[in-house]
Amino acid sequence: MATKFPSFNQGLAQDPTTRRIWYGIATAHDFESHDGMTEEKLYQKLFSTHFGHLAIIALWVAGNLFHVAWQGNFEQFVLDPTHVRPIAHAIWDPHFGEGITEAMTQAGANGPVNIAYSGLYHWWYTIGMRTNEQLFQASIFMSILACWVLFAGWLHLQPKFRPTLAWFKNAEAQLNHHLSVLFGFSSIAWTGHLVHVAIPESRGQHVGWDNWLTVLPHPAGLAPFFTLNWGAYAQNPDSLDQVFGTAEGAGTAIFTFLGGLHPQSEALWLTDIAHHHIAIGCVFVIAGHMYRNTFGIGHSLKEITEAHNTRHPNDPHKGSFGISHDGIYETVNNSLHFQLGLALASLGVATSLVAQHMGALPSYAFIARDYTTQSALYTHHQYIAMFLMVGAFAHGAIFFVRDYDPEVNKDNVLARVLGTKEALISHLSWVTMLLGFHTLGIYVHNDVVVAFGNPEKQILIEPVFAQFVQAAQGKMMYGFDALLSDPTSSATIAANSMPGNHYWMDLINRQDALSSFLPIGPADFLVHHAIALGLHTTALILIKGALDARGTKLIPDKKDLGYAFPCDGPGRGGTCDSSSWDAMYLAMFWALNLIAWVTFYWHWKHLTIWQGNMAQFNESGTYLMGWFRDYLWLNSSQLINGYNPFGVNSLSPWAWMFLFGHLVWATGFMFLISWRGYWQELIETLVWAHQRTPIANLVGWRDKPVALSIVQARLVGLAHFTIGNILTFGAFVIASTSGKFG
């Protein structure tokens, strides 16, 4: 038996070429393809990896806590969170000369330091942390937690503690556990922390390990809870002139429904946040008691899905609704790829919403005034959402190749989707062309007339429908008089009749960037449709890749070729680029394109509002040269001056990263615009030269060098393209924002 890598594939381990190494790495996590893998073993291995994942997260969190406690300035930040720039960690670098050492000695530090743009300081401050000692304690706790979950991962691989396949496939038990215990209890536990620690700290009352059992979070204690007088917990909220972190203007309420932002911290009211978490927690605990499990009460998922059926005797829609769902329960419950696809899609949407809401409804005290952090967090979460969404479709496609059973799904809703794929794909194609030609056409028209000195001839379209939606939520500036912007509407009367004070109208109608609905005009209308083009094109490529995964008119037996194949054999020209993997690979370029437009839009619009110069976005955002000149070029200028012959400033590391990001990005094209034959010939030439150079022959190789496969080379190209893209734009966002606002 071969002992070479990879041990999980003995056939590959005996491959005499370097293909062994690259294919081994490529399939290391494709547990399904490993030698001797059974379904039960597969589930057990995956379950164990979850604990490893949790350990990595815990160690990462511990590292952040430890370095800030050791090298940061958290206690100074607590004293003045709007002016003290948070320090991520110190820098030790032997290359640092006097100039850069001086430039990077910032934020009151004694030596070179990195500034934190993660928002962690604001989060720790908001949840009631105040000292470095507390950060150290949290770091130690997270390190212990990491060890504990690593042990749990190892334990669940031992014969006595391996869960059975039946346990993994008990969908109802799994749903109940995740809903009630993981979501429900954790939300209620977090409410407990907010009520017992964070809210008292925000009112100047310290709660620690020494007194947390003796300090009542509310003067009335639990009496209102047991007497069902829950409204007592909402009475006497913090006043509008409360100073965050002190007793000045503080109330006693713990669960409120105030809406809007705390006037001083410019974040959501902590008592509103606590109310949100207790409500969510209760909803999830109830949801986790809905499915039939140990006691035989509750819903069966199989019965629920199969009742969605026009042939069902109790169908209330008399055959007009609910195509057969027979087989859907088995299909989802037996396919890890289907489940992963659903999970990734859900998480992708949630992550994108987090990006939006961190800016529109900031929940951490004073974070809204840290413009660089806000820009970094928005960009970070939108990029993550993009990766998750593409991953969702990738695993959807793998499901169709590996797990889909036409017999189980005969004539059900999934089979109907496959059966109508031509209509779905062609409609998406039509939408992308309509969006692309019209949006680009208007942009280019506007460029031409501006270039020829007639800016008044631009086509400028007011987004009236979007403005109406904003007005319906209470935005007054458009004069639409709809729902909440109409003082006589039933919505306004209902809102005004609610007891107590409420501040969401103040938030919506703010004049600064903190308004939850920023004013919009023709520039927003155009970029909105550009983003819609990116979304629909990415979706088109992904959906086509998944729905065509099993076969097409061109390649009817595609499912037998697998998820990733370069071409359909040497005898069939014109079949390259047709595997589902290729569709996901091609979609990544559009996804990166799209997410750049999304983040460009958010960043430029906010930069102009923060600078008090919104007219720049409104006027320059209606034509392409305006975007290139007044957003990209203008905001790159500080960056490219991070270092020059006359010296350096604190932006120089970002300037270098900006340059390096371009290099990594451009390197991607070397792999993307070449095929395997070129590299194979080059390698053979280098081998020839090596063998004819006496001194070089002192070094040999066990594996015969061969070029990467077509698919692997594409992956290498895409990886460089993606990482370069992110390095470049990340450096641009942070440097262009911090260069203006610190």
Swiss-Prot record:
Listed GO MF terms: 4 iron, 4 sulfur cluster binding; chlorophyll binding; electron transfer activity; magnesium ion binding; oxidoreductase activity
Binding positions for divinyl chlorophyll a B3 per the UniProt entry: 670, 678
Residues noted as binding divinyl chlorophyll a B1 in the record, renumbered to the chain: 662
Protein name per Swiss-Prot or TrEMBL: Photosystem I P700 chlorophyll a apoprotein A2
Subcellular localization: Cellular thylakoid membrane
Chain segments annotated as coiled-coil in the UniProt record: none
Binding site for [4Fe-4S] cluster: 567, 576
Keywords: 4Fe-4S, Chlorophyll, Chromophore, Electron transport, Iron, Iron-sulfur, Magnesium, Membrane, Metal-binding, Oxidoreductase, Photosynthesis, Photosystem I, Thylakoid, Transmembrane, Transmembrane helix, Transport
Topology of this chain in the membrane: Multi-pass membrane protein
Residues that, per the record, bind phylloquinone: 679
Superkingdom of the source species: Bacteria
Catalytic activity: reduced [plastocyanin] + hnu + oxidized [2Fe-2S]-[ferredoxin] = oxidized [plastocyanin] + reduced [2Fe-2S]-[ferredoxin]
Note accompanying the cofactor annotation: PSI electron transfer chain: 5 divinyl chlorophyll a, 1 divinyl chlorophyll a', 2 phylloquinones and 3 4Fe-4S clusters. PSI core antenna: 90 divinyl chlorophyll a, 22 carotenoids, 3 phospholipids and 1 galactolipid. P700 is a divinyl chlorophyll a/divinyl chlorophyll a' dimer, A0 is one or more divinyl chlorophyll a, A1 is one or both phylloquinones and FX is a shared 4Fe-4S iron-sulfur center.
Pfam families given in the database record: PsaA_PsaB (PF00223)
One cellular component (GO) term of this entry: plasma membrane-derived thylakoid membrane
Residues annotated as transmembrane: 46-69, 135-158, 175-199, 273-291, 336-359, 375-401, 423-445, 525-543, 583-604, 651-673, 715-735
Chief location category: membrane
Described function: PsaA and PsaB bind P700, the primary electron donor of photosystem I (PSI), as well as the electron acceptors A0, A1 and FX. PSI is a plastocyanin/cytochrome c6-ferredoxin oxidoreductase, converting photonic excitation into a charge separation, which transfers an electron from the donor P700 chlorophyll pair to the spectroscopically characterized acceptors A0, A1, FX, FA and FB in turn. Oxidized P700 is reduced on the lumenal side of the thylakoid membrane by plastocyanin or cytochrome c6.
EC number: 1.97.1.12
Family named by the database record: Belongs to the PsaA/PsaB family.
Subunit structure as annotated in this protein's UniProt entry: The PsaA/B heterodimer binds the P700 divinyl chlorophyll special pair and subsequent electron acceptors. PSI consists of a core antenna complex that captures photons, and an electron transfer chain that converts photonic excitation into a charge separation. The cyanobacterial PSI reaction center is composed of one copy each of PsaA,B,C,D,E,F,I,J,K,L,M and X, and forms trimeric complexes.
InterPro entries (UniProt xref): PSI_PsaA/B, PSI_PsaA/B_CS, PSI_PsaA/B_sf, PSI_PsaB
One Gene Ontology term from the biological process aspect of the record: photosynthesis
